[in-house]
Design a protein with these regions (language model features):
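Conserved pre-motif I regulatory segment
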Residues: 1-38
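Walker A/P-loop
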Residues: 30-49, 59-62, 171-172
Length: 184
């Protein structure tokens, strides 16, 4: 399926916004990308569409439970099998979602960076065909990764544990030169 056809089918749009097509092409080609686009500029679509076009499951690292829920709700409304795994879930909900992930039921799974250190999640991820890893709000790697959310600095270790390195797509609305270097 061509990307414009997939865009129309999954999201109802007939054209890309500025910069989206180029980022999507890079991800589909298996390259790492850093997308810096304004708030409301369509960053999420730049990793969601490739996730739908590629085989496997995309892991999306997101800093806030509310962002995860909003993204997953929108995807599910569009008929996309997706979920989030975070601390808001009960033990039963968590077990059910991990089992669904293990069975490959989801095209996208949203997690906080801390989840990448959870033994059971890492074991499941190592068994999956991971299409890509997306880091939403990637400026948090620099701004939160040093003290407040040190798990952001652990993302490369998680990627190294995977049997096959997937493309990594990082997205943010704001990034200074220093932040860009830290993300890379």
């Amino acid at each position: 399926m061509e990307k414009l056809e997939a865009l129309k089918k999954h999201f109802g749009y007939t054209a890309f916004r500025s910069g989206q097509a180029q980022l999507i092409d890079q991800i589909l080609a298996g390259r790492d990308v850093l997308g810096i686009m304004p708030t409301g500029g369509g960053k999420s679509l730049c990793y969601q569409l490739p996730a739908l076009m590629k085989r496997g499951t995309a892991i999306v690292i997101s800093p806030l439970i509310s962002l995860m829920k909003d993204q997953v709700d929108g995807l599910v409304e569009n008929g996309v099998a997706s979920t989030y795994i975070n601390s808001s879930l009960s033990g039963t909900e968590l077990a059910a979602r991990l089992e669904g992930l293990r069975r490959g039921e989801f095209k996208l799974v949203y997690v906080a960076p801390e989840r990448l250190n959870a033994r059971e999640f890492v074991e499941i991820a190592r068994m999956l065909d991971i299409s890509l890893i997306a880091v939403d709000e990637a400026h948090c790697i620099s701004q939160w990764g040093h003290d407040f959310r040190p798990s952001y600095k652990e993302i490369p270790k998680f990627i190294q544990r995977l049997p096959v390195r997937p493309p990594v797509a990082a997205f943010t609305a704001t990034a200074t030169t220093f932040v860009k270097e830290e993300i890379k």
